[in-house]
């Protein structure tokens, strides 16, 4: 059994049957739904086996089409119910693909044997249906609660799963991106048409990270070139085009050796480590990645420790070979492509 109570000397005496302290033991986000049922998987398969050279070389080709119906997904419900979500059987996904597997007996003697195997597959998945009436979801992976615009994945009807959703990085600002510099107020003024990335990074200045604006420019806006959440787009796909593996198995008298390797081709990775190690987010002056080493990043201080950020000509010359933004310009982790 598991005890459901405890004693703590830090808690002062209370009153009533359960004291004056409130403890929430259950997540009240989802309301109970008595109508949920098992998900249903429909599998369609066509395959054939083959063998050559007295089965020393054999293999299998498999073509499939699988559909998962009545997928359990959370649906939004009115807040006045006391809950925010209701689990319902309304989602549907499908997978279509082909797989090839090969086996070869290369050597077969009394004391020694060697065989190899290889497999490769191509799978294409599709989101057929989401919650009732919903066509798109912007989801969060949850890896960092401080992530700016924390919803970093997109799912929509007709699309594939695993789509990374974020901003498109456009390098960093250089001195040439600015119309003027006011030495008195130490402020930079962007040229007309240059994107204002301040909602994501620090006030635009040379060396700060820059992002692409993908939405149409609104001439009636007070700042038409400023970045907004609407400028996010699909920046990657975590589903590989091909995946597979190959292996070797060898035996010699009483000994055996096995090796197996997996591979995936043409897919993207949400590299959260790289995000954290190229920004000031939660870094607390710890180590950065090599991408922002002193000989690569934009620097506002020269080798002697002199501040040069307010000297446009010197700043431009000193950073002419920089390939990375200044990491201090980004204070929170951002889902972006670069």
Tell me what each language-model feature is.
Residues 225-226, 246, 272:
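Flexible, glycine-rich loop/tail regions that form catalytic "lids" or insertion modules at the edges
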Residues 57-59, 114-116, 246, 252, ...:
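Transmembrane beta-strands of outer-membrane beta-barrel proteins
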Residues 270, 299-338:
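Membrane-interface anchoring segments and C-terminal beta-barrel signals
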Residues 1, 88, 105-234, 278-279, ...:
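Conserved small-residue
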Residues 1-157, 330-338:
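Extracellular/periplasmic, surface-exposed regions of secreted and cell-surface proteins
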Residues 252-272:
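Glycine-rich phosphate/pyrophosphate-binding loops
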Residues 64-69, 78-80, 263-267, 274-280:
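Active/binding-pocket-proximal capping segment
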């Amino acid at each position: 059994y598991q005890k459901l109570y405890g004693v703590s000397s830090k808690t002062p005496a209370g009153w009533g049957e359960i004291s004056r302290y409130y403890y929430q033991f259950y997540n009240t986000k989802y309301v109970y739904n008595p109508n949920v049922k098992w998900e249903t998987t429909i599998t369609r398969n066509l395959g054939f086996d083959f063998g050559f050279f007295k089965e020393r070389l054999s293999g299998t080709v498999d073509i499939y089409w699988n559909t998962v119906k009545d997928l359990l997904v959370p649906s939004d419900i009115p807040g006045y119910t006391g809950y925010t979500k209701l689990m319902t059987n309304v989602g549907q996904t499908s997978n279509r693909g082909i797989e090839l597997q090969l086996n070869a007996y290369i050597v077969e003697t009394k004391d020694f044997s060697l065989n190899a195997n290889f497999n490769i597959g191509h799978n294409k998945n599709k989101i057929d249906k989401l919650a009732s009436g919903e066509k798109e979801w912007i989801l969060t992976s949850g890896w960092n609660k401080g992530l700016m615009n924390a919803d970093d994945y997109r799912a929509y009807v007709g699309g594939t799963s695993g789509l990374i959703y974020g901003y498109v990085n456009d390098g960093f600002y250089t001195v040439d991106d600015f119309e003027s510099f006011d030495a008195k107020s130490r402020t930079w003024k962007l040229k007309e048409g240059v994107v204002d990335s301040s909602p994501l990074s620090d006030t635009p200045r040379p060396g700060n990270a820059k992002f692409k604006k993908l939405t149409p420019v609104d001439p009636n806006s007070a700042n038409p070139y400023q970045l907004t959440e609407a400028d996010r787009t699909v920046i990657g796909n975590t589903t590989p085009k091909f995946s597979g593996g190959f292996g070797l198995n060898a035996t010699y008298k009483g000994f055996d050796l096995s090796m197996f390797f997996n591979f995936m081709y043409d897919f993207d990775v949400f590299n959260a480590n790289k995000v954290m190690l190229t920004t000031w987010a939660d870094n607390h002056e710890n180590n950065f990645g090599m991408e922002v080493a002193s000989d690569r990043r934009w620097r506002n201080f020269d080798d002697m420790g002199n501040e040069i950020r307010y000297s446009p000509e010197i700043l431009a010359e000193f950073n002419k070979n920089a390939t990375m933004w200044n990491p201090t310009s980004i204070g929170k982790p951002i889902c972006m492509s670069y």
